[in-house]
């Protein structure tokens, strides 16, 4: 009888496409469905999803007519307690929280995690039930009317989401593309600036929506148009688009002031600009075939230096900060800024070599990415 020996194999690793199954490391997976590598070792089941805002972002729920269309959501960002979203030509906001205790279908005081961002009275949505309320504290909604608008009262478990409906911010962002955005605070108020590649960049502080067009009464100077990338850096707002080599910036602490005498200006690089990202007190300028970095504090000492003139970024929506570095999609795969600075365009700088076969199949329409920090994950989504 043959001797049988036990061997402990640690299950870890991820998808490996550049090796055949016989030469892959022991414990690596050949096929995973709804599983992911765990930062604690081995594999874990991918968590399910839950709606953050219960109502769909559409004309019916926004009170608009033929404005949102049926295409994809173009923006999803959080500002304070609000979710800011865009679809079609409409920009809107909503707020959500969750129950912190079980509730029966008849209670009229609802205990939640936080009521910040909610009006002092209004309408809530939980499951398929509509609830109105007349008051609130920091963690409760009071005077609730259950089963409003002919909906059916229901009981809810702890952690179930409860949200407002959508409130329209603007409906005139014609022909908008997918948005880039930056959060900033120049004057003691948290704001978000958004750019869609077709309309003027705009800012929003939770209450006031302003076009950054340099117009009389809200700003000055000649504002950039059809901006695709926007980023706040050193108390200036920076604007760029892929059809131009020009990087425009506002006056300090004034995102809608484009007057050179007040400190606004522009910088030209030798390549079409794809995207922007601030990292370690420097502004990285990702171009089609090169990458530059801007340092300094104002127009008096801004300096632009090349990171590489031999390789660029394919899509602005691939740029993310993770693990103390910037990652972006280059022609030869996913790269880090640190690796690119160190060894320029050498192929060894790619971090996606083991899945290059999958990277080569990427379609660059509707590409986007996100970082899941608690899992140390960079996720790239593409059709």
Residue ranges and their predicted role:
Residues 77-78, 84-85, 104, 117-118, ...:
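Residue-level signal for WD-repeat beta-propeller blades
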Residues 80-81, 88-89, 189, 197-198, ...:
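Surface-exposed loop/turn positions within WD40 beta-propeller blades
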Residues 86, 90-93, 166-167, 201-214, ...:
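Surface-exposed loop/turn elements that mediate protein-protein interactions on large endomembrane-trafficking
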Residues 94-108, 113-179:
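Small/polar beta-strand repeat architecture
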Residues 172-178, 216-220, 225, 309-314, ...:
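Short coil/turn segments at the loop-to-beta-strand junctions that recur within blades
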